[in-house]
């Protein structure tokens, strides 16, 4: 047993939890780890967030507020921010990703979009509770695609013209995000962070990076998921249905279907540039190769927009010139 695990065991004893078994529950794209602790009184989750690398404060604060507005997120039962340990209620082991198929998707996504509406309408009670998703952050995120995926991982020597195209497109996508109405944004609202629960489905995880930002961001995270994809026609129907629900719920969104879909699609391009860059960074910086296989799907969402948005053509030409089968060759430059 390593020192950190021993510290966790000692802390559990300190808070009066006597475990029958402890096993890894999951790890995410950060330095956090999660363990499932089984006791005579039930099952719990321990978040291990090393304090020199992770701050548990945002998780605690956001969890409390999200529970107050009616979302099914873990309850923080015990906390020690100094040591970096939280004891959480257990939302189970059934991720959306493991359950989604053609038969289940309408029901599961229906519940997820209902919860998303609770999140977005809840933001009107206190919009300043979360930090702004501003232009510098949007641009920094997209730069990960250039720096970590194209240059670091694929080893591309980008021309001045290609660099200009990338920067111009980054600015365009940031402007699209900022012209949208704002609501609370989970920021990773996808199938690996949604749990199927018997009551109050879905359970929602990994919300500590939430911000106040573009109203289509979480919707595109859900419907253009980096880990599972659906036919374009089906996605458009979901988007139109959610736009209608948004208007009925009083969200300040456009009534124009074409404009809303453009917001959604270009927001997706921003998110997918960021995500593809993060997947490459996770390999080179953190030694996590498992996300590399998701990069072709992620950038593929952008390529699918070729005939819909001429303003994205220069970016898509760069993307389509790359052999994406090479992305999983982890012997690349490190």
Residue ranges and their predicted role:
Residues 31-38, 46, 119, 171-219, ...:
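Active-site acidic catalytic loop and adjacent metal/ATP-binding pocket
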């Amino acid at each position: 047993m390593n020192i950190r695990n021993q510290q966790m065991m000692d802390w559990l004893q300190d808070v009066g939890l006597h475990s029958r078994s402890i096993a890894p529950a999951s790890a995410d794209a950060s330095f956090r780890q999660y363990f499932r602790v089984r006791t005579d009184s039930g099952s719990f989750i321990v978040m291990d967030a090393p304090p020199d690398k992770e701050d548990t404060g945002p998780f605690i604060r956001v969890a409390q507020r999200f529970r107050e507005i009616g979302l099914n997120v873990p309850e923080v039962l015990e906390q020690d921010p100094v040591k970096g340990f939280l004891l959480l209620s257990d939302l189970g082991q059934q991720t959306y990703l493991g359950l989604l198929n053609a038969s289940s998707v309408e029901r599961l996504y229906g519940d997820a979009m209902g919860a998303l509406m609770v999140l977005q309408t809840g933001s009107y009670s206190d919009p300043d509770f979360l930090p702004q998703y501003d232009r510098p952050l949007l641009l920094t995120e997209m730069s990960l695609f250039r720096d970590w995926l194209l240059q670091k991982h694929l080893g591309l020597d980008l021309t001045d013209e290609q660099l200009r195209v990338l920067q111009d497109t980054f600015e365009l996508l940031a402007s699209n995000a900022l012209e949208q109405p704002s609501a609370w944004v989970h920021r990773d609202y996808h199938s690996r962070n949604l749990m199927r629960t018997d009551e109050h489905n879905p359970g929602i995880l990994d919300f500590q990076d939430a911000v106040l930002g573009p109203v289509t961001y979480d919707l595109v995270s859900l419907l253009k998921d980096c880990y599972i994809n659906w036919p374009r026609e089906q996605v458009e129907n979901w988007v139109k249905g959610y736009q209608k629900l948004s208007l009925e719920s009083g969200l300040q969104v456009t009534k124009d279907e074409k404009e809303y879909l453009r917001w959604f699609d270009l927001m997706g391009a921003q998110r997918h540039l960021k995500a593809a860059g993060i997947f490459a960074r996770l390999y080179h910086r953190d030694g996590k190769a498992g996300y590399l296989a998701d990069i072709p799907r992620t950038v593929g969402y952008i390529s699918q927009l070729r005939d819909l948005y001429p303003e994205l053509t220069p970016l898509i030409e760069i993307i389509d010139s790359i052999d994406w089968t090479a992305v999983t060759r982890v012997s690349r430059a490190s």
